[in-house]
Amino acid sequence: MSKYESEFSCQDKFSVFYGTVATLFFTAMTTLTCPFQQLFIFLAFFEFAVVALYVCKSRFLQVLHFQYQSVAYCVPIFLFVTSIYYEFYPKETHEFLESFNFKIVKDFIEEIPIFFPSALWFLWTTRLFHTHTVLVRLNTEYRLDDPKSHDLGPIRQSSFHSSLNIAAITFFSILAYSGNESIENICFWIAIFELIMTVTYVFNNSWIMMIHFVGQAIVFSVIFFLLCCLLAYEYSPVAALEFLDSYGLVQVKSYVVRSPFFVASALSAVWFSRMMATHVFLVEVATDTRIHRHQMSNHFNRLIQNI
């Protein structure tokens, strides 16, 4: 039995702490009167379930939770960046939020001190990296306990993963030069980000890959939102269009009306597969580093004992 299985480590206590804080936060958010009240109820229940089931020490549950944290990271980082921008350019920020009909966000940054979105962003960021280290530790102990996977040799990027990265660069480059004017700049910078991250894979640095994965998760949150809108439009067109009109999402409405559901489903599936490939690769690279460190430590200890 490994050390992880035999005792509740400090890392486990931090995981439970983060989960408890998140549960209390979403529970408090359910008291607000807003369109996302049911979503907050679901998230509060999900966080509570993860904390309650943490004693099972399931790697699948940890991976699922990490994926959720990464996708949901778009909310605290958007609030944090918007709050900072509002401190220096209040008029421009107000106009930007008004143009997208983000009344809830506008009221939030105008009434809440910048400390709160900053604290939310900091806590969610540290939690994200903490969950990553937990997964790396679990994978390290699994490989150390299994002689067949103890030393896999140099971890190399699969051709499938490389192809998906190149396809993403091409996809956003095409959108940047042939898309709508309002998203051209966004797609251009995403293409640049994808190119830089893909090139940095030669360093085999798991923390750089982690940044790439989080960026992919943030983009996936948009893709998944569009898929949900299309799914709602398939079953209840009138209600879906009324919802989009109420938030002034004219471009999203146009996309929902003219885009096939199959295309959005395929894009979501491919992007999620890419996220999983990136996550598996970065965990294996980080694990490989830990195992080599463990081997060097054992070798050094044996030398000391011989001396």
From Swiss-Prot:
It comes from the Eukaryota. This is Uncharacterized protein C48B4.11. It comes from Caenorhabditis elegans.
